[in-house]
């Protein structure tokens, strides 16, 4: 093994896929690129595939990997690329696709099939219908590959990914437990569960990762717990994969384990951050892992863990990162600056909420400012100062109007201005409750629940818990 490979500091486990290359270094870098792509760290994945290409410019699968890593994914479809980023990305992908096609004749039949399929993944235009058409074309192409090579675990994972991206975060109807109309959730469930019966499947990060994403929105998320337990320590330095089991831990109420997995994920993320910094899109996943640790601690009643995680998250989220325009980092990340408010509300730390300063940059920190108004409003209501709570409620309403529709909430893929409508109703309920208008208060909280239920699936907000607590307080009263 060459010097470059020996110096690579990330423990990615042992997963390996042999590709057509006589260069051992190229093979090592290819494996790393593939694992990182399964871990949704697409920038590091692309970097590894570029290293593989540098070692063996004739390896078609390295170009395939580069094109795949730079394309759309479950958390970032084509329409969430900004214009400048999209143009640059498509140029790189198109070059990689050409090179992959040129070198494919020297590859295996399966590799040639993958190279042919990924050609369909590039949109013919830059409109919404172009993105939809290329996603459908790619899924159809991968279906043909799967029909020929259905026992291959990588093919199964890539096919599952292509189909799930047609209905990303909308795979199941959360009210009925049935597949969302038009989705192919049961089909994906069938071939992923077929793959889960194969030998060595529990060493495959892609299958395990996608099965968790598939089942977390279903009415039976617990069926994926075995897969989650195998994924938990499979790729120790891929923070997102270490975090993924906590999606299920939270849903089944295993908050202690959710805290443990997310704590490990944050350490892995910090290891990467210490070497590469935070000026990359993976910072979104890094923030999500902190956020998940915080939420698990909130559900478990562990204020110390939650507040320590908030402080770590805030230290790694400077204004310089939020100011990056392409991709528009403020749209993806600024909402995480507001998470401290949720923690202080959850643990009833009213004086700390009232002492929270407002950021100076009202445009950059528009979500954070709105959330602070929400938190201060709850604090004033809880302390019996209804007049000041109403003042904060009015300020919250105006602050929400200033949030651009492009700002994503921490509960991806929901938008911040939509999610804060839940907060408005919750605050209305708190104020009415303190005014003694219990029926009105509960109607507001029911409205908050209704708005919360209308959101696209994401890690849960504790609206129902708040409503239940309020009813309990009324009974005690």
Give names to the regions the model predicted.
Residues 45, 93, 156, 188, ...:
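Solenoid-repeat scaffolds in large eukaryotic assemblies
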Residues 2-58, 63-151, 158-198, 208-218, ...:
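Short coil/linker segments at helix-helix boundaries
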Residues 301-328, 334-477:
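Helix-coil-helix junctions within alpha-helical repeat/solenoid scaffolds
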Residues 205:
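Active-site-adjacent "gating/activation" loops or surface patches in catalytic cores
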Residues 256-273:
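Flexible glycine/proline-rich, aromatic-decorated loop/lid segments
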Residues 202:
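Soluble catalytic regions of membrane-associated enzymes that act on cell-envelope
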Residues 42-43, 135, 185, 220-221, ...:
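TPR-repeat structural position
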């Amino acid at each position: 093994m060459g010097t470059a490979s020996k110096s690579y500091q990330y423990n990615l486990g042992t997963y390996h896929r042999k590709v057509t290359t006589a260069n051992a270094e190229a093979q090592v870098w290819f494996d790393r690129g593939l694992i990182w792509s399964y871990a949704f760290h697409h920038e590091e994945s692309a970097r590894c595939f570029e290293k593989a290409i540098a070692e063996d410019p004739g390896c078609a699968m390295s170009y395939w990997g580069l094109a795949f890593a730079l394309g759309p994914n479950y958390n970032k479809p084509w329409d969430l690329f900004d214009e400048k980023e999209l143009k640059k990305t498509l140029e790189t992908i198109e070059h990689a696709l050409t090179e992959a096609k040129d070198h494919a004749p020297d590859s295996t039949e399966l590799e040639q099939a993958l190279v042919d399929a990924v050609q369909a993944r590039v949109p013919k235009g830059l409109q919404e219908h172009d993105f939809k058409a290329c996603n459908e074309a790619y899924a159809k192409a991968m279906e043909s590959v799967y029909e020929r090579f259905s026992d291959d675990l990588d093919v199964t994972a890539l096919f599952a990914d292509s189909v799930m991206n047609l209905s990303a975060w909308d795979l199941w109807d959360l009210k009925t437990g049935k597949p969302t109309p038009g989705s192919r959730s049961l089909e994906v469930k069938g071939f992923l569960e077929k793959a889960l019966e194969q030998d060595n499947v529990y060493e495959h990060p892609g299958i395990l990762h996608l099965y968790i994403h598939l089942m977390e929105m279903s009415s039976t998320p617990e069926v994926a717990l075995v897969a989650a337990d195998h994924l938990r320590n499979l790729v120790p330095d891929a923070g997102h994969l270490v975090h993924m089991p906590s999606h299920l831990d939270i849903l089944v109420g295993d908050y202690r384990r959710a805290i443990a997995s997310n704590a490990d994920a944050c350490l892995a993320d910090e290891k990467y951050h210490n070497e590469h910094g935070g000026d990359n899109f993976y910072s979104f996943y890094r923030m999500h892992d902190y956020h998940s640790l915080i939420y698990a601690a909130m559900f478990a009643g562990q204020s110390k863990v939650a507040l320590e995680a908030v402080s770590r998250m805030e230290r790694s989220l400077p204004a310089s990162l939020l100011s990056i325009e392409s991709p528009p980092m403020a749209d993806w990340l600024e909402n995480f600056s507001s998470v401290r408010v949720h923690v202080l509300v959850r643990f009833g730390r009213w004086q700390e909420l009232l002492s929270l300063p407002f950021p100076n940059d009202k445009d950059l920190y528009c979500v954070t400012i709105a959330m602070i108004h929400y938190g201060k409003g709850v604090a004033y209501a809880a302390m019996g100062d209804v007049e000041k709570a109403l003042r904060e409620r009015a300020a919250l309403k105006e602050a929400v109007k200033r949030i651009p529709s492009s700002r994503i909430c921490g509960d991806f893929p929901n938008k911040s201005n939509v999610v804060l409508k839940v907060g408005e109703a919750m605050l209305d309920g708190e104020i009415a409750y303190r005014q003694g208008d219990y029926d009105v208060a509960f109607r507001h909280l029911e409205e908050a629940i209704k708005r919360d239920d209308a959101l696209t699936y994401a890690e849960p907000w504790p609206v129902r818990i708040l409503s239940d607590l309020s009813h309990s307080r009324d009974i005690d009263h």
